[in-house]
Every structure is written in C-alpha cells, then in structure tokens.
Amino acid sequence: MVNTHVNLPGLDLKNPVMPASGTFGFGDVPAAQKFDLNDLGAMVIKTTTPHATTGNPQPQIAILEDGVLNSVGLTNPGVDQVISEKLTKLRHQYLDLPIMASVGGDSEDDYVEVAKKLSASGLVNALEINVSCPNVAQGGMSFGVHAGVVEELTKKIKMAVALPIYVKLTPNVTDIVEIAKAAESGGADGISMINTVLGMRIDVKTRKPLLGHNMGGLSGEAVKPIAIRMISQVRQVTQLPIIGMGGISTAQDVIEFILAGANAVAVGSAHFEDELAAKHIAENLPAELEKLGIEDINDLVGQVKFN
C-alpha cells in the first residue's frame, strides 16, 4: 500500500493534492459541488480582503494554446461575509477537511486585519499569504517583489495569529531565493509557489490586448518549467514545507514537483480542461508511485539527481 499522507504545519493531508486558491471559489462553484472535496488533501479558498472587491474589467480570462491568462482580480465579498457565510457553510459541509484561507490586501494593516479575523473564526487550519497584491502605499508594486517587505509583512502576521502561515511567492522577481529566505526569516511556517507569471497577448485584428486589464497572470503548462526550476532553487536553501503549483495536470506532474522539492501541490488551470482535475490527479497518484516502486511519497521530496 502506497503512503500518500503528508503532514504539514496545520494541514494533515490524506494526499498532497489541493486546488489552487481561486479555483473552487469558497467551495461554492459548480465544479466543487460535483464531487466530495474530502477526496483531496485540503481545500484552499479564494483570496479574501478586508472589504468587498469586484475584480477587473472583462474579459478577465483568455485560454491560450499552452496555458491560461487571467486578470480576474480578487473578487470576494470581504472577510466578514466570507467568515459568516462562505466559510461557515464550507466548514459545516466538511467538518474534517483541512481548509487553508488565502489572505490579501492593499496594505500591511489590511493583511493583518484579514489574517486575525480568519484565525479567530476557528474555521480554517492555515493561512496562505498572497503577497502578489499591489502595495498601494508603495506606488502599487507587488508586496512580494521586495525581500524586506515580505519579511516585515510575514513578521507582523505571524505575531497577530496563532495559525501556521504559508507565504505565496510571486515568480515576477529577479531572485526568488532571496524572497523565500525573507519569508523564512519573518517566521513563515511554509511557502506556496509559484503564483502566476505576468504576461500579455494581443489580438492582431483589433490590436487590443486579449484581457480587459491588458496584462494578467499566466498559468498552466507554459509555466511548469519555471515553477519546477524555482521550487528546486528554493529547496536548496530551506527546509520549510513547500506547496508547489504551476502547470500541474497529471499525477506524474505531482511526482516531478515533489522531486524538485515540493511537499504538496495545488492544481489550478488544469480545471479548464477537466473540472475534476484535482480529484483525478489524487486518484491516479498511488498507481503512478507504485509504477516507480515508491512506498512513501514523502521519501521523494527534493530527491532530484542533478547532472
């Protein structure tokens, strides 16, 4: 019997597969209603902000040959309503499923406020800190591009909450290793990586970008080599748990990410092709491990053999 159980801070996972934040909303999107979320290791909810956010102009999503470009924005009803309605309902439906909430904001105070409220709710097991949000006080640059800002933000949230926190790294930086080290110095319990890669596509007939917001985040197959490279680099400098993401669509991809250094994975864009992608990947994983003669998935973490 192959062991796929993974134990991370705050997250006791029956298998290492979860949906990426935003994929299944707050567990209320049609795809999430079509199967038992207990088939997954955990549920990750959409990024939550202090107040309701409407998102970016349409079109928000462009499906490409080898990925997805999106500028949905952080559409959510605000943290109070997320707790009183969305999370309460989700937790009532799934009493034992590990739930990770994603935290966003325009300022450090926003992050701390949302994190404190989510932590105090008693409805979630861990927090993912989405540092790809624009830092309004610093001219709109993403929080996640400055090591000093990431360290300080992580420290402030860590001091304010009892829950484990996972800092979600943006790949749109010169040196992701420096940012990962900063998150660890700030007290992060784990790292999620990678968020989407900033991109743009243009319709040659209209000469307009495909997205209403012009630029957006690229995810899916196209970013997989970037994600694997960055996870491998970060694994060389930290023992923190890593939740890997970026183009995972098969059980074999999961194994590749774990060899690079991830402990668990999140699946996002694959759901555009198969709305039950995460479920199918989790189901297929034991057989793939068996083929490779692996008895315990945890034995594979970071075991890439460099040339």
Swiss-Prot record:
Q: Where, per UniProt, does this protein localize?
A: Cytoplasm
Which Gene3D superfamilies does this chain map to?
A: Aldolase class I
Give the binding site residues for FMN: S21, K46, T47, N130, K168, I194, G220, G246, G247, G268, S269
Q: What processes in GO biological process is this protein linked to?
A: 'de novo' pyrimidine nucleobase biosynthetic process; 'de novo' UMP biosynthetic process
Q: Which cofactor does it need?
A: FMN
Q: Which residues form the active site?
A: C133
Q: Which Pfam families match?
A: DHO_dh (PF01180)
Q: Which GO terms describe its molecular function?
A: dihydroorotate dehydrogenase (fumarate) activity
For this record, the Gene Ontology CC terms, alphabetical, are:
cytoplasm
Q: Cytoplasm as a keyword?
A: yes
Q: In which pathway does it act?
A: Pyrimidine metabolism; UMP biosynthesis via de novo pathway
Give the reactions, separated by semicolons, that this protein catalyses: (S)-dihydroorotate + fumarate = orotate + succinate
- Identify its protein family: Belongs to the dihydroorotate dehydrogenase family. Type 1 subfamily.
- Specify the protein name: Dihydroorotate dehydrogenase A (fumarate)
